[in-house]
């Protein structure tokens, strides 16, 4: 998931 935890995942 993109931006799920502000890591760009």
From Swiss-Prot:
Keyword Repeat appears in the UniProt entry: no
Keywords: Amidation, Neuropeptide, Secreted
Subcellular localization, as worded in the UniProt entry: Secreted
One BP term from GO: neuropeptide signaling pathway
GO CC terms of this entry: extracellular region
Superkingdom classification of source: Eukaryota
Signal peptide: none
Modified positions (Leucine amide) in chain numbering: 9
Family named by the database record: Belongs to the allatostatin family.
Known function: May act as a neurotransmitter or neuromodulator.
Protein's name in the database: Carcinustatin-11
Organism field: Carcinus maenas (Common shore crab)
